């Protein structure tokens, strides 16, 4: 099977649909991570930046405010098309978007000063090959800065679903490179350091970042519940439950979220990621 074919199928189908439909809400929900990423990446007006797994373009367009040029790469055509529309509407001329698999894409060597990524580097079926390919696209003194999720247990916004599911079904252990591509593939800092070292990076640092996020960027209770349960990982967790029990799981989740709901604000939940930096 060609590299990342399963990921390409997913992100050009059901996985992308929810992100495209709710792009603005995802941007607001993830804003703390975007700010942390760009602060750690640093700002330089002469930088040429590569944004891998750029999705609908929020981080690419934000980076373009201070960079010479930013190229966003994603294998999802629907998300890249949305990112291009956003750039046109915002009249941001120094951002461009490419539909490509960063694991195998033929980057011009030494093109980019900086790699950034917001939750876009966990889905490679050959991570060493992917990070090596990306490193070759960086200049000899290039840098990398990205964010990736910590484990399921550290993310309240998903654990409340997992806890409800466990009342009816067993859940496997999630996370780690040994389990293949997925949301939690890079949840272990020791594995991140080893992986990046194998790909030729050094001076790797993994710093914990645990903000409170506003689920769906705010909204009423019903909308927030629907938004959460429509996402890829929540749907995956619900998939472990027999269909006859799913309504009960949803009721439990609704009750948990109702307890956390703030009128006029929305639902605040704890999240956890690693902010990773490295030298090419």
Language model: regions and residue ranges:
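Conserved catalytic/acceptor-binding region of the Class I
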Residues: 26, 128, 143-217
């Amino acid at each position: 099977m060609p590299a990342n074919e399963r990921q390409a199928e997913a992100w050009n189908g059901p996985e992308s649909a929810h992100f495209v439909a709710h792009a603005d809400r995802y941007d607001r929900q993830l804003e703390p991570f975007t700010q942390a990423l760009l602060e750690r990446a640093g700002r330089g007006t002469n930088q040429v930046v590569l944004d891998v797994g750029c999705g609908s373009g929020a981080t690419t367009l934000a980076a373009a405010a201070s960079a010479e040029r930013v190229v966003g790469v994603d294998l999802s055509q629907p998300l890249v098309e949305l990112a291009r529309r956003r750039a046109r509407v915002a009249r941001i001329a120094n951002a461009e978007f490419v539909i490509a698999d960063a694991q195998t894409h033929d980057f011009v060597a030494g093109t980019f000063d900086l790699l950034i990524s917001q939750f876009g580097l966990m889905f490679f079926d050959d991570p060493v090959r992917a990070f090596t390919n990306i490193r070759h696209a960086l200049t000899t003194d290039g840098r990398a800065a990205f964010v990736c999720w910590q484990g399921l247990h550290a993310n309240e916004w998903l654990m409340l679903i997992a806890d409800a599911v466990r009342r009816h079904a067993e859940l496997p252990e999630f996370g780690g490179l040994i389990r293949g591509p997925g949301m939690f593939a890079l949840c272990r800092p020791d594995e991140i350091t080893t992986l990046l070292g194998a790909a030729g990076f050094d001076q790797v640092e993994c710093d914990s970042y645990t903000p409170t996020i506003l689920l769906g960027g705010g909204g009423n209770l019903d909308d927030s519940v629907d938004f959460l349960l429509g996402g890829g990982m929540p749907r995956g967790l619900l998939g472990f439950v027999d269909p006859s029990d799913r309504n009960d799981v949803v009721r439990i989740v609704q009750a948990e979220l109702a307890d956390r709901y703030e009128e006029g604000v929305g639902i605040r939940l704890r999240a956890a990621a690693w902010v990773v930096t490295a030298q090419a």
